[in-house]
Each structure stands twice: as structure tokens, then as C-alpha cells.
């Protein structure tokens, strides 16, 4: 079977070989896999991909997966703008979301003590998230492509003087000890992940109370303000508004919006109201609000 994207693990698991796994970015043990388990359950098979583009390609291919999991924003770093573009160009719909607390731990092989550590390996973002702790030591900091990859290499090479920074799942999968837990500086750090499924396979979700849309306003003065007023007038909470430049235009933007509602009739009414003020509306998904959002 020819792959449509770059898959890190070239050998499929039995489940994902039947197109039943979900594509994720990063290696096994990554935060993407933790998000997949939180949504689907611990038995879900994952298809690790090198890039977000590959996540979308694999998720869009019925022969290779049943969908995908893709990070879209972080409570500290903000939105991952290129992923909005990937979503817009795909045949995928949002069918769910996960808000995952990002907890970084210092991992070592069994028997390694804190005084044995000379180097710490991890993704550059994870290292930056933990600098307040790392500054206490004179360790060499080495950047890798993925938090879980650093854990995997430490286990494979049986390193006695190298520690890694990664999540709890990476420690479990690679049989590493969490020598110091929760070394991240900002204790309230969440990443929001979208659960993606092919449009042809997606079905109406019972109890849905959130929608993600993209719209382009017409060029009338105050059009965006009027759109937002109409949305609020239908009792809908606008939980996110993200502008995106439209390729090939000079400072013309589309807007990604997350809308929270109590019943779908509110959404239907709002979409009908704003239609006359917009040049285009695209519904990316109607789904259930994540149950574990940060307060």
C-alpha cells in the first residue's frame, strides 16, 4: 500500500493496517497520542507522522486511517496558524476536541540518579517551557525533533548520563523513570487538539454544542462588527476569533470562529442571519465542547 504522507513507523499495526488507526504528529508517546487516547480510549492505534501536513494526508485517506488528531492552539503559545490552512484545504471535518494539560517530566533510565545527569534532550519548545528548572543545573541542553523521540533514544541507547523531557506516556512506553515530575514553569498549560474525520464519513453528533466556522465578510463598512453582533444576538458565545490572510490578496482576511451554543437552532439562526453580510461561510465541524477545558 502506497502511503500519501511520511509515516514515522513504516510498519502499520494490525488495526491501523485496516484503516482503523488515527494519524498523529510525532512519535509514539507524544502528547498527540495522549490526546488520541483521551478521546478514543487507551486501545486506539495511532499512525505517527512526521508533519502536520502528513497527519492531514493520512487522515484523508480511507485506506490508511479512520481520521486524525491535530493540535490547533496552545494556551501559552497561541494558535498554530498553518494548521488552519491545512484544515481549510482538506476534506476533513472536526468531530471533537481535546484540551490536554501539558505536563513535562524529567525522564531517565532505571537506576540513573539526578547527580548522574550531564545532558538533557528534548524538543526546543519543551526545553523552553522548563528553563526555570533547568537553569538550576549546569546541564548541556540538546534539542531533538520530538519529546517522545528523546525518550525513545535514551531508552534505546541505555544512556546513563542523559535525561529527557517528555510526558508521562513516553515514560510508560519506553520504560523510563520520572526522576523529577512537573518541571514546566507555567503550571497551567493546555493544548487544544482537534479530532478530524473525512467529510463523507462524519455524521451528526448528538448533543453537539460547539461549531467551528470560517467566513469572509463583504466589504461594507463595519461588516465584521455586525456579524459578531448577530452571533451574540442569537445567544451564542464566541469563544475564539482568528483572522487569516487570504492568499493572493492584499490585506484581505477570512475569519475562523468557534461558536458555543445550547441548542443547534441557535446556530442555524445565526448562520442564516450572517449570510447576507458574508461572501462565504464554511462549516468545519459541529461537535461537543471539550469536557476538560481550563477555567
Question: For the regions a protein language model found, what residue spans apply to each?
Answer:
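Domain-level signature for soluble enzymes in the chorismate/prephenate branch of the shikimate pathway
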Residues: 1-295
Amino acid at each position: 500500500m502506497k502511503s500519501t504522507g511520511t509515516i514515522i513507523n513504516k510498519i502499520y499495526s494490525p488495526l491501523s493496517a485496516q484503516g482503523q488507526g488515527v494519524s498523529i504528529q510525532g512519535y509514539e508517546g507524544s502528547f498527540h497520542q495522549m490526546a488520541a487516547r483521551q478521546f478514543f480510549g487507551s486501545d486506539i492505534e495511532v499512525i505517527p507522522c512526521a508533519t502536520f501536513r502528513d497527519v492531514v494526508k493520512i487522515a484523508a485517506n480511507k485506506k490508511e486511517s479512520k481520521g486524525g488528531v491535530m493540535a490547533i492552539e496552545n494556551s501559552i503559545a497561541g494558535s498554530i496558524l498553518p494548521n488552519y490552512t491545512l484544515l481549510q484545504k482538506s476534506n476533513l471535518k472536526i468531530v471533537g476536541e481535546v484540551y490536554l494539560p501539558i505536563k513535562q517530566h524529567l525522564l531517565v533510565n532505571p537506576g540513573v540518579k539526578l547527580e548522574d545527569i550531564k545532558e538533557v534532550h528534548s524538543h526546543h519548545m519543551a526545553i523552553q517551557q522548563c528553563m526555570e528548572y533547568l537553569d538550576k543545573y549546569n546541564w548541556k541542553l540538546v534539542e531533538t525533533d520530538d519529546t517522545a523521540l528523546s525518550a525513545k533514544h535514551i531508552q534505546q541507547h541505555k544512556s546513563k548520563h542523559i535525561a529527557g523531557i517528555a510526558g508521562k506516556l513516553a515514560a510508560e512506553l519506553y520504560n523510563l523513570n520520572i526522576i523529577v515530575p512537573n518541571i514546566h514553569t507555567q503550571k497551567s498549560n493546555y493544548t487544544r487538539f482537534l479530532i478530524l474525520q473525512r467529510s463523507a464519513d462524519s455524521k451528526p453528533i448528538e448533543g453537539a454544542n460547539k461549531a467551528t466556522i470560517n467566513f469572509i465578510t463583504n466589504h461594507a463598512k463595519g461588516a465584521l462588527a455586525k456579524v459578531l453582533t448577530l452571533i451574540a444576538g442569537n445567544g451564542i458565545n464566541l469563544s475564539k476569533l482568528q483572522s487569516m490572510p487570504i492568499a493572493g490578496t492584499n490585506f484581505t482576511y477570512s475569519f475562523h470562529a468557534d461558536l458555543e451554543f445550547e441548542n443547534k437552532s441557535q446556530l442555524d439562526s445565526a448562520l442564516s442571519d450572517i449570510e447576507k453580510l458574508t461572501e462565504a461561510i464554511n462549516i468545519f465541524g459541529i461537535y461537543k465542547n471539550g469536557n476538560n477545558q481550563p477555567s
